[in-house]
Regions:
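A generic transmembrane alpha-helix motif of multi-pass inner-membrane proteins
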Residues: 3, 195-196, 205, 222-270
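Helix-loop-helix junctions that connect adjacent transmembrane segments
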Residues: 1-114, 246-249
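Membrane-helix boundary/coupling elements in multi-pass transport proteins
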Residues: 39, 44-52, 110-147, 186-196, ...
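TM-loop-TM module centered on a large, flexible mid-protein loop between adjacent transmembrane helices
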Residues: 64-126, 145-192
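Transmembrane helix-loop boundary segments of multi-pass membrane transporters
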Residues: 95-98, 112, 174-202, 217-222, ...
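Generic alpha-helical transmembrane segments of integral inner-membrane proteins
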Residues: 3, 68-80, 119, 163, ...
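Helix-loop-helix connectors at the membrane interface of multi-pass transporters/channels
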Residues: 52-56, 61-69, 125-163, 198-201, ...
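Transmembrane helix-loop junctions and nearby membrane-interface residues
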Residues: 2-9, 78-85, 173-177, 204-211, ...
Length: 270
């Protein structure tokens, strides 16, 4: 799509950029919140660190290189897509990249994109499945979840945690079954983004509080303030951008963890 798109590029498609009916700031806020989902879990390479060779070098390298390549692909493919299709066509398309390629290469091109989308989806599913079982397992090891999540089979796979988390995700999908596929996808993206942003919200200020608690000199705060404050402001902006429905859903989901946390805290001590 990127290569072919630039041969039939139409700059008129970029004007007007905002056709949502909202103000530019509101449109940018919502769009950024949706886009931010693609970069959630940028720290995910650290989660399976125990099973990675030479993690001190491999993880930073994989994170930086992988993010850079992904960012370039996203930017170039998005620009090419907008150069091929009018914004209204993109908004009404359930598969814009396939439709854009189909406009140039016909049905054959759409099928190629569909095949690549399936391959990409399977690859993403593998990665998310790994995280889906590793995070609960590590929480269980730290006595923040039941030990059932750290139980493994003969291949060292925490299969019980995988089954439980898969059931929970399936229930969430069934609750929103009345919506069409596009709305379900948007809802899940924004709700997932909100739940992750809560973590980023506290992390963005954590180093400052740690330094303050340890009574470190003011000069030690400089780098923390330079990175922490902008990150905090950006996180708050993104939380606002996900919308009321996703915020409420996220709060409900997160609230389920509160009794579990206190129960595990008491159980761990006993």
């Amino acid at each position: 799509t990127v290569i072919v798109g630039f041969f039939v590029f139409n700059t008129d498609n970029f004007y007007p950029l905002n056709i949502s009916g909202e103000t530019n700031f509101e449109a940018i806020t919502v769009t950024t919140a949706l886009t931010f989902f693609a970069f959630l879990g940028i720290e995910s390479a650290t989660i399976p660190a125990d099973g990675i060779k030479n993690p001190e070098k491999t993880i930073p390298k994989a994170t930086i290189i992988g993010t850079t390549i992904t960012l370039m692909i996203y930017i170039l493919s998005s620009i090419a897509l907008m150069g091929i299709m009018h914004p209204s066509e993109i908004a009404n398309s359930s598969a814009p990249y396939a439709d854009a390629t189909g406009m140039i290469l016909g049905e054959y091109g759409k099928n190629i994109i569909a095949i690549f989308a399936i391959i990409s989806g399977i690859g993403c599913l593998n990665g998310w499945t790994l995280l889906q079982i590793e995070i609960p397992k590590n929480l269980a090891k730290n006595k923040l979840l039941s030990t059932i999540f750290s139980d493994t089979n003969s291949r060292e796979v925490p299969y019980k945690g995988l089954i439980i988390s898969t059931i929970l995700v399936s229930i969430l999908l069934l609750i929103n079954y009345s919506k069409d596929l596009s709305n379900i996808f948007t809802y899940l993206i924004l709700t997932s983004t909100f739940c992750t942003l809560i973590l980023y919200f506290f992390i963005s200020l954590s180093e400052i509080f740690i330094l303050y608690k340890k009574r470190k000199p003011l000069k030690k705060f400089k780098s923390s303030l330079i990175t922490g404050i902008p990150a905090f402001i950006f996180t708050v902006w993104m939380i606002v951008g996900v919308g009321k429905e996703s915020i409420i859903s996220g709060i409900v989901l997160l609230s389920f963890s509160i009794p579990i946390y206190f129960y595990q805290k008491k159980y761990a001590k006993s």
